[in-house]
């Protein structure tokens, strides 16, 4: 008798994606981050659902409802901190996942890569709107500053901002709609993730060598289900360590003060995972230019497949490209640090140099390195 998982219409799909899926035999721990992102999304949806049961999206009661969750709801403090730090874990996994894609040339699967960029934008939008919900000082002022950037769009800018706000400032209407969007977007992310996987399974996974692995495939289960489970345990442990021992390590103390439109915080800054983009935005002294640079800092990922000049797919055997890749990582860390600093000397200059280097590395230096490596290998 044929196994039910191979014949049942629904189980057949699960079987082809998670059990009998042919996978390369040599994929390293860098290939774990996709499943870890799936776990993060599930954690965020469940903790978010329980938070939404007790949260009220009204400017008068939002802050106190968040406090009420921490003080009066059974394990409410844990649910809230798992959700807040779960977002940080989500972005750590996201950046590692994208970094892996760049290093090993996974971006040559252009459909998968482009859906991935769309997912990145959607997750960033969701996280931004979630940060507004507790209605602390940084929630209000972060929302005001970031939404105000749209006013740089010529002609329609001001009208667009007021349309998003639902008034003439970030107020009750804004908070209510942000809550609605923050609730629906994770489900859109889940749907996009399925499309992401659909495109990936059309081609099969890449592997560290960048060489086609059709001649050497192994079943996903049990080999990679066990490997993913180890990743799940490590991620869960790290998240629990964060949530139970240092829940406010990655947050901003200003967000424990209720939102006050009459009092501006000394340093308005987003959560740590947006600081690199925020630093790029601030490094350009023109509003529209800054907004374009901000969008391009993520959208630049879309041109990476077009600028692949090397005859090899992966960077595994390309020392010159490897060096540039790790300089890019260091540059992003520098930008993250600068984004959290006040706008004064020497931080302004460091931010500008790091921003120029970021775009130069991706658009000029890395494609150039590919050509040089081809030349050295006489290809």
Curated annotation (Swiss-Prot):
Membrane topology annotation: Multi-pass membrane protein
GO annotation (BP), single: mitochondrial electron transport, ubiquinol to cytochrome c
Principal localisation: mitochondrion
Gene3D superfamilies per record: Cytochrome Bc1 Complex, Chain C
Note accompanying the cofactor annotation: Binds 2 heme b groups non-covalently.
Function: Component of the ubiquinol-cytochrome c reductase complex (complex III or cytochrome b-c1 complex) that is part of the mitochondrial respiratory chain. The b-c1 complex mediates electron transfer from ubiquinol to cytochrome c. Contributes to the generation of a proton gradient across the mitochondrial membrane that is then used for ATP synthesis.
Domain of life, source organism: Eukaryota
Binding site for heme b b566: 97, 196
Protein name: Cytochrome b
Note: Heme 1 (or BL or b562) is low-potential and absorbs at about 562 nm, and heme 2 (or BH or b566) is high-potential and absorbs at about 566 nm.
Cofactor requirements of the protein: heme b
Residues binding heme b b562, per UniProt: 83, 182
Protein family (similarity comment): Belongs to the cytochrome b family.
Pfam families assigned: Cytochrom_B_C, Cytochrome_B
């Amino acid at each position: 008798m044929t196994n039910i998982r191979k014949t049942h219409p629904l189980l057949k799909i699960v079987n082809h994606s998670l059990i009998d899926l042919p996978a390369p035999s040599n994929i390293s721990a860098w290939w774990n981050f996709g499943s870890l992102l799936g776990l993060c999304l599930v954690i965020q949806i469940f903790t978010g659902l329980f938070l939404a049961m007790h949260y009220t999206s009204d400017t008068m009661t939002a802050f106190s409802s968040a406090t009420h969750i921490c003080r009066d709801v059974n394990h409410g403090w844990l649910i809230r901190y798992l959700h807040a730090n779960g977002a940080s874990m989500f972005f750590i996994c996201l950046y590692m996942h994208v970094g892996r894609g760049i290093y090993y040339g996974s971006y040559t699967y252009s459909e998968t890569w482009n859906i991935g960029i769309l997912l990145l934008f959607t997750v960033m939008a969701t996280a931004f709107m979630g940060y507004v919900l507790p209605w602390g000082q940084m929630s209000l002022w972060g929302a005001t500053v970031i939404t105000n950037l749209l006013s740089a769009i010529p002609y329609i800018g001001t009208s667009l901002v007021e349309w998003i706000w639902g008034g003439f400032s970030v107020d009750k209407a804004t908070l209510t709609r942000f809550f609605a969007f923050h609730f629906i977007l994770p489900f859109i992310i889940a749907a996009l993730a399925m499309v992401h996987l659909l495109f990936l399974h059309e081609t099969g996974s890449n592997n560290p060598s960048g060489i086609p692995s059709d001649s050497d495939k192994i079943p996903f289960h049990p080999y990679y289900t066990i490997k993913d489970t180890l990743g799940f345990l490590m991620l869960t442990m790290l998240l629990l360590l964060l949530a139970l021992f240092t829940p406010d390590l990655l947050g901003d103390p200003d967000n424990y003060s209720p939102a006050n439109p009459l009092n501006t915080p000394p340093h308005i800054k987003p959560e740590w995972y947006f600081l690199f983009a925020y630093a790029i935005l601030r490094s350009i002294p023109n509003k529209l230019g800054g907004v374009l640079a901000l969008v391009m800092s993520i959208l630049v990922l879309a041109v990476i497949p077009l600028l692949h000049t090397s005859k090899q797919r992966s960077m595994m055997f390309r020392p010159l490209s490897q060096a540039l890749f790790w300089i890019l990582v260091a540059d992003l860390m520098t930008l993250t640090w600068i984004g959290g600093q006040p706008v004064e000397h020497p931080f302004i200059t460091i931010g500008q140099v790091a921003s120029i280097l970021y775009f130069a590395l991706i658009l000029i230096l890395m494609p150039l390195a590919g050509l040089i490596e081809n030349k050295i290998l006489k290809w």
